[in-house]
Amino acid sequence: MCERAARLCRAGAHRLLREPPPQGRALGGLLRWVGARMGEPRAPLVPDIPAADPDPGPAAPRGGTAVILDIFRRADKNDDGKLSLEEFQLFFADGVLNEKELEGLFHTIDSDNTNHVDTKELCDYFVEHMGDYEDVLASLETLNHSVLKAMGYTKKVYEGGNNVDQFVTRFLLKETANQIQSLLSSVESAVEAIEEQTSQIRQDHCKPSPGVNESRYGGPTPPYIPNHKLVVPEPVKSLPVAIGEPKEEGLEVQISRLAELIGRLESKTLSFDLQQRLSDEEGTNMYLQLVRQEMAVCPEQLGEFLDSLRQYLRSTAEERNCFHVAAVRMADGLTFVIYEFWETEEEWKRHLQSPVCKAFRHVKVDTLSQPEALSQISVPAAWCTSGRD
């Protein structure tokens, strides 16, 4: 009897274990849990707010900043990390803004009133005024990096590639140059149009007058970097000023002193035969503009400077309104003086905006060891008509 009862108990237990739990009981428990949760007081929902970054880090630099900063570093001739008013005027003078306007711009950028503008402060000012040029300068940064990378690839192909690889690389290189040149031509056309307008403005406001003139002119950037400083050397300041119709005796004194001065500077006599272009009977201007540039060149940049100087002299000599141009190399081998005779001061200022003059200025920014000294003076045209000795 006991054994049978035990078997029945075990069979019942196994049956209960095999049967699934009653569905109604489970569903009822779930409904009771949901009802209890719905009856609880509920706090209003608040959207998740991302936690504040304790250290967001510096903001990403604006596009094109690296290009502008690199250009302005070149204006810092003494590499002290800041620009003085003199360096600022030297770099940015373009013949349109006068010295007073440039000084006002300098103090506007010099927000901390230290009488110096650091290159970052200068860069920040121009970045805020870049407009659509931000994308252009940012693209130049990328283009510069890509071109350098492509040049490395070209070298690698030409050192170890087959003829087909070299052909493809050569084709792509030429097409790249053509595309870049096409873009450059468009930009240069815009520059020339603007320069033509500004040249007309200068013609309306500038009137040539005989005598000694001291002023600042220049042409950056960026692509053309200004680098002119018009500082009259001490010997020129001692020359008498010719105003109006001087007496014949005073004119002779001026001619003698001017000839002596240039003779000392060049260690030789300048002589020109310009009678055919300077006839008083034709009402030709009685004065010429003599422009003198003195430049000290860095020894390691001498070759580049000489190549650019030769090109500048050839091109300037071909200009119709330039009567004569000559360059003299001083005894130290690193100092050069250029003399230019122009029909009028306006013609010389127009020459400052020519492509050859801008290209020469661009080279001077990189090759000169100090700012150039430049002076101009009106000289009697009759002095240039003497024959060669």
Curated annotation (Swiss-Prot):
Domain EF-hand: 63-98, 99-132
Residues bound to Ca(2+) 1: D76, N78, D80, K82, E87
Keyword Cell membrane: yes
Disulfide bonds: none
Cellular location(s): Cytoplasm; Cell projection, Dendrite; Cell projection, Axon; Cell membrane
UniProt KW Disulfide bond keyword: no
GO molecular function, one term: A2A adenosine receptor binding
Function: May act as a signaling scaffold protein that senses intracellular calcium. Can modulate ligand-induced internalization of ADORA2A and coupling efficiency of mGluR5/GRM5; for both receptors may regulate signaling activity such as promoting MAPK1/3 (ERK1/2) activation.
Oligomeric and partner information: Interacts (calcium-dependent) with ADORA2A and GRM5.
Protein name per Swiss-Prot or TrEMBL: N-terminal EF-hand calcium-binding protein 2
Source organism of this protein record: Rattus norvegicus (Rat)
